């Protein structure tokens, strides 16, 4: 029962970026071809481009090495960022009080699959 695998997945856990900022980047590359996504990420000024670029690289490497898929045919099928654990810190304020600082983390997941429209 040999099943033909057409997708590969990569996930980065506890990335030190807020999920809201990561989602801004992921929304721009979702549904694009891998080469187009690399070009977009290279010139996008947002802060979350570096971890998304690394996860995309990992997903493409998984597709090529584990499942023998061609990089030119890959499309970003799914891209999402879930909330990871929040690190809580305190900043001293006036009159002996303190303000809470939440340092948010994300779990970034990208799934790449072969393009269904081959030759079209």
From Swiss-Prot:
Keywords: Ribonucleoprotein, Ribosomal protein, RNA-binding, rRNA-binding. GO terms for molecular function: rRNA binding; structural constituent of ribosome. The lineage of its organism: Bacteria, Bacillati, Bacillota, Bacilli, Lactobacillales. The keyword Glycoprotein does not apply. Gene3D superfamilies: Ribosomal protein L22/L17 (3.90.470.10). PANTHER family: CHLOROPLAST 50S RIBOSOMAL PROTEIN L22-RELATED (PTHR13501), LARGE RIBOSOMAL SUBUNIT PROTEIN UL22M (PTHR13501:SF8). Part of the 50S ribosomal subunit. It comes from the Bacteria. GO terms for biological process: translation. The keyword Ribosomal protein applies. This is Large ribosomal subunit protein uL22. InterPro entries: Ribosomal_uL22, Ribosomal_uL22_bac/chlpt-type, Ribosomal_uL22_bac/org-type, Ribosomal_uL22_sf. GO terms for cellular component: cytosolic large ribosomal subunit. Belongs to the universal ribosomal protein uL22 family. CDD domains: Ribosomal_L22. This protein binds specifically to 23S rRNA; its binding is stimulated by other ribosomal proteins, e.g. L4, L17, and L20. It is important during the early stages of 50S assembly. It makes multiple contacts with different domains of the 23S rRNA in the assembled 50S subunit and ribosome.
């Amino acid at each position: 029962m040999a099943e033909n695998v057409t997708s590969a997945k990569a996930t980065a856990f506890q990335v030190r970026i807020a999920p809201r900022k990561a989602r801004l980047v992921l929304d721009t590359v979702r549904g694009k071809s891998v080469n187009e996504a690399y070009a977009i990420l290279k010139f996008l000024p947002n802060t979350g481009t570096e971890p998304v670029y690394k996860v995309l690289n990992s997903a493409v490497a998984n597709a090529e090495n584990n499942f023998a898929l061609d990089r030119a045919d890959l499309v970003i099928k799914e891209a999402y960022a879930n909330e990871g654990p929040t690190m809580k810190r305190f900043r001293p304020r006036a009159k002996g009080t303190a303000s809470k600082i939440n340092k948010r983390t994300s779990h970034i997941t990208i799934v790449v699959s072969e393009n269904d429209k081959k030759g079209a």
